[in-house]
Amino acid sequence: MSDIPELTDEQLARVIPSSVRKRLILGQFDSGEDIAALRCFVGLTQAQFALAMGISVHTLRNWEQGRRHPEGPAIALLRIAARHPRIIRENIASIESAA
């Protein structure tokens, strides 16, 4: 069973301002802080978010700390996470329950 708390979309939307969320939906990740904000918006730990995205925690940390930048398909997945956080949360919950 997943230890992710159930939050409404409205509660999730309060985590980051709508102006920042709009930039993220457009794939405008100006800094590692934007990716960290998105992860917090989705409501997952680094390990959970990395698993849901199909990347290593090391890669996610590099993005969040600004050492590397997501490209191509990773940006598309980040946009999906910004638009549909519940889908990402459901994905990780199903992965964790299957383990």
Predicted region positions:
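N-terminal positioning helix adjacent to the helix-turn-helix/winged-helix DNA-binding module
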Residues: 31-34, 73
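Conserved hydrophobic/aromatic packing and binding residues within compact polymer-binding modules
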Residues: 35, 49-50, 60-63
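DNA major-groove recognition helix of helix-turn-helix/homeodomain DNA-binding modules
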Residues: 73-90
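Recognition helix of helix-turn-helix/homeodomain-like DNA-binding domains
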Residues: 55-70
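Short basic helix-loop element that most often maps to the first helix and adjoining turn
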Residues: 34-48
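N-terminal flexible/basic segments that precede or flank functional cores
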Residues: 1-29, 87-99
